[in-house]
Each structure stands twice: as C-alpha cells, then as structure tokens.
Amino acid sequence: MIRSCRIQGPNNTAISFADHLLNRSFFTTSIVNLDAQFNLQASTTSHDDPAKIIATQLSNCTTLQELNQIYAHVIRTHLLQLYPAPFHWNNIIRSYTRRDAPTKALFVYLAMSRSGVLPDCYTLPIILKALCQLFAVEVGRQLHSVALRLGLDSNEYCESGFINLYSKAGEFENARNMFEQNPERKLGSWNAIIGGLSQGGRAKEAIDTFMELRKCGFLPDDVTMVSITSACGSLSDLGLALQLHKCVYQAKNVDKSDALMLNSLIDMYGKCGRMDLAYRVFSRMEQQNVSSWTSMIVGYAMHGHVNEALECFRCMREAGVRPNHVTFVGVLSACVHGGTVQEGEFYFDMMKSTYGIKPHLQHYGCLVDLLGRAGLLKEARKMVEEMPMKANSVVWGCLMGACEKHGNVKMGEWVAKHLQELEPWNDGAYVVLSNIYASRGLWKEVERVRLIMYQRKLAKAPGYSLSTSGD
C-alpha cells in the first residue's frame, strides 16, 4: 500500500500520500512501516500539506494510544523541524490535554521549548490547563516569567489560566494579584477568580467578587453562574439562592435547558435545605442526567430524608441512568442517617458487583460510620484494617465517635493512638478519649489525658472567673 503512493497518476503527478494517510485504520496499524517508507519529497511537493494531514489525524484520533502513535511519527519524521510554527505544537499539546494526559502534554511543551520554538497566546492557556490538572504551580511560575518576557501576561486567556492555576494551588493572594494587575480585565478573568475562590472554599469572597463584577457593569455568563451558585450552596444562604436563580436567566449564553446550569441550581437548593425547590428544578428538566439524580440523592441524604433518597435512587435505576461513585456516596450516606446496616451493605456490594465501581475512601468511610453507629465496632474495625487504602482522619474520627457513643474504652484507646499518629497537633482524639474514660468513671485516666494535653500544649488552660463573692 505504501508503494502505491509512489506510482504516477493520470497527469504524471505523484498520487497524494494524504489519500492513504487520512485513512485512520491504515495510519494506526501501519505506523512502523509508514515511518520506514515515508517519502518526504513526494509528500511535500504534492498539493497536500503534511502538517495539515497530521492536524487532521490529531482531530480524528479517538484514543491515547493513537495519539501516542501520531506524535511518535511526527518526531521520527522531523515534521516539527520542517514546520516549526507553534500552531503544530499547540495541536499536539491540546490533544493530550483533552485526553486527560497532562504529563505528556507538559513533555511536549518542554520538547517545544528545547527546539527553540516560542509559545504564543494559544500555547500558554493550553499548557496551563495541563498544569492545573497536575497542580504543578512551580512550573506555572516559570511559565509566568515566560509570559511576562513575551508580553502575554495580560492576554485574557493567559491571565485566566494563571488565576486558575494559582487558585487550585491555594495561592489565592497570587491569584488575586494576577487579577488586580489588569485594569481592563475581561469576563474570563472574572470567571477564573470567582471559580477559584468558590472551589477553594472561599465562598464569601466569591460572592463579594461577583457583586463587584455586577457593579462594574459586566453581565455574567453560564460559567459565572455555575461557580456562584456553588458558592451560595456552600453558604446555605437561601435568600441569596433565590436571587441568583432569577439572575440565571438574565445571564449571557444561558440555555434554559442547560443541564450543567440546572444541576448547579439543584445542588444549591439542596445545600440550602430546600429539597422542594430542588425537586421543582429537577422535575422541569427535559432530561435528567447522572449528575441531576445524584444531586437529588445527595441533597435528600444530607438532610436525613432517607426514604426519599433511596426512592430517588430506585427511580434513577428504573430510568436507565447508570449511577457513578458519587451517587453511591449519597446512597450510603442515607443509610448512615437511617441506621440501616443491611441496606448499606447491600448497596455497597451492588456498587462493586453490579456496576463495577471500585470503592473509594468515602465509601469505606460511610460503611465504617454505619457499622460504628450501630454498635458493630468489631466489624467496623475489621473494615478499617482490611481497606485497600489507609484510613484518613475522617474515617478514624467516625470510629472514635462510635467508641464514645458506646463507651468502648479498649477500642477507643486503639483508635486514639492512630489519630494521634496521623494528626499529633489535633486535640480532638484526646478530648474524646477523656470523655470515654469519664463515662466509665476512670478519673485517673481522665487526669492523665489532661496532663498529656497540657504538656503538649494541645488545650487551653482552664478559665478563671474574675468576680468575687463580695461583688
């Protein structure tokens, strides 16, 4: 087939190599032969630009394996040396980023830098997305220096990319400085800072920034509203939630049937404790997706509406919507609130056997909490010991709370030891252990724990009243 590329056409010109290269099945299965027999002169003198052919292949490839083969071919044929414009590098970096391969995207960027090709205003936003996925803030700082040297730091997309990166790394001061330095900032930069604050647990600051955006005369878009409704949900501010719901339909680029926007409203009302309003939004959706159902289930579970949460899950399955790992966190949380051990174990097994979902730490945590609250402390301990990952402070805390509830001194001491090793600065384990001892009348042990806390400066000294009986 490769040889057929060299035969003469009806007008004595070489038949286009692209006719074969654009056949993806040929390209991916014959990559080694393609490299060995590639006739560079024929392809560059034909009417088809090899760089365009590669760009088409990049847009058509569907798997990471195909993308790796394309990039390997590009490197072996020195195509990027023949066409050194950043456009071709950008295409490859973008393709890796879209396929959730940020490390490979970064490697391609480094190869681009080594080859002497300077990034442009399209390169930096793409690679910054990859760095956000990697939380590679140090590399981001180096890129910031590059952007300053090339005068790209004030570009709207570069600016929002750096704000996103700093926010995800928890460097909100740097993100804010980046935002403030440009007096002519665009909506993308506003969205980046609001989204970063919202996702970083700074809901009040996100709301304040949104108010500032409105005062500056900007009309929010769908991206703004998704971020700000999430922030509002974190504050559980119903009054603000109702105002934001009205604001949604005044925003730019908001489709009234947009699932992402409607799901954010469901989540917001759920966190505000108004499941009736969440259900109203849910029921009016043209089509509910897995996030819609999950938001309802999690909302019901959060507020102790056990029957409603489990009924919603049943309806979800009947509707043919496949649950994900977040859905099962909601379902198991409902079982915890309801104290239904058998149902919790049933759904935990269903998640693994029926849907093939590998349990996360949150799922194990729910089951440990469920067993502990029911007084099944041995079973809860066994689950902690047999989990494929190490328990975090939340899981240990659930078990510690169960030990306090049921007055189990021996297990309480065992859990406290692990909590102290995990978080030696945290006085919570000592306080609960002291309470367990007190519930059993073990006052010497109570004094011993208090002395340890005092020596390690883990608790404040007891307060004293300044008043006297003569006052």
Protein language model annotation of sequence segments:
Residues 1-186, 195-471:
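Terminal (and in a subset, N-terminal) low-complexity or junction segments at the ends
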